[in-house]
């Protein structure tokens, strides 16, 4: 059973007297910086010259500096730019200023696990990975709650890296909900597999193909969208709230019977075999190599596929329906 830590296991005082540099001010960077600041931690945000986020961060009461300067003055350097941009930012702005005994933190293990970033052995390396988007990390903190986090130590040069990691997790509110001990390998491989086979790749194809089957059979696209896409959130919310059993208890008996009798016909043994292949490609680095090469080639296949998916009928119909819904209009205000 994996070890769980809560606020009682974390000492926020460990970060007092240390300066934390948050490199990047996107979804996670924004949340981490503000939560740490509100927790009494000395924070500086590191950005590139001319960043659109510079004024925003300053307006929210944060000190901002060029990334290299932020890394130079900090004891803990937190790299929260996108995975594909991390190597360049690390090499140009962080590595020259990462002296012995400093701490380097990641929120995802990709570049460490796949050897794209290799810190010196005299640097502490750890991960705190909130299991939720940045806006949720921030809103939950403001409500006195928190988003669960994963924590791992990759290098412990000074012998107290886990203490610093747990203090950081507490500082962003994660220890209120629970901090699960893991490894860089486990976090990276399970995260990538979950995204590809279930949460993103699996679910989007399931919704899209379900929509296509109904439309090709002559049903109205709007009805197909509601049944195969829109209602997904309603089902997932029930699962998140109380598990699969809670969802099945909440739906009709007819729906539950259909779940049991048809589910295995859709997700077959062949599907499971393919999912195992996907996992193997994550484990042996095939996916990572392909993604790294795609980025080095300026993303031709990725960009083409993104454009194609955006023009799919399910997206066109979905936008039209959302524009008609009062709750959707309200959420955009």
UniProtKB/Swiss-Prot annotation:
Residue numbers binding NADP(+): 25-28, 51, 53, 83-86, 134
Ranges for domain KARI C-terminal knotted: 183-328
Cofactor: Mg(2+)
Classification via Pfam families: KARI_C, KARI_N
Binding site for Mg(2+) 2: 191, 227, 231
InterPro entries: 6-PGluconate_DH-like_C_sf, KARI, KARI_C, KARI_N, KARI_prok, NAD(P)-bd_dom_sf
Entry keyword annotation includes Oxidoreductase: yes
GO cellular component entries: cytosol
EC number: 1.1.1.86
Spans traversing the lipid bilayer: none
Top-level enzyme category: oxidoreductase
Chain positions recorded as substrate binding sites: 252
Keyword set, alphabetical order: Amino-acid biosynthesis, Branched-chain amino acid biosynthesis, Magnesium, Metal-binding, NADP, Oxidoreductase
Active site location: 108
Binding note for cofactor: Binds 2 magnesium ions per subunit.
Positions with a binding annotation for Mg(2+) 1: 191, 195
Domain KARI N-terminal Rossmann span(s) in chain numbering: 2-182
Molecular function terms from GO: ketol-acid reductoisomerase activity; magnesium ion binding; NADP binding
Function: Involved in the biosynthesis of branched-chain amino acids (BCAA). Catalyzes an alkyl-migration followed by a ketol-acid reduction of (S)-2-acetolactate (S2AL) to yield (R)-2,3-dihydroxy-isovalerate. In the isomerase reaction, S2AL is rearranged via a Mg-dependent methyl migration to produce 3-hydroxy-3-methyl-2-ketobutyrate (HMKB). In the reductase reaction, this 2-ketoacid undergoes a metal-dependent reduction by NADPH to yield (R)-2,3-dihydroxy-isovalerate.
Family affiliation: Belongs to the ketol-acid reductoisomerase family.
Protein name (record): Ketol-acid reductoisomerase (NADP(+))
UniProt organism field: Alkaliphilus metalliredigens (strain QYMF)
Lineage summary: Bacteria, Bacillati, Bacillota, Clostridia, Peptostreptococcales
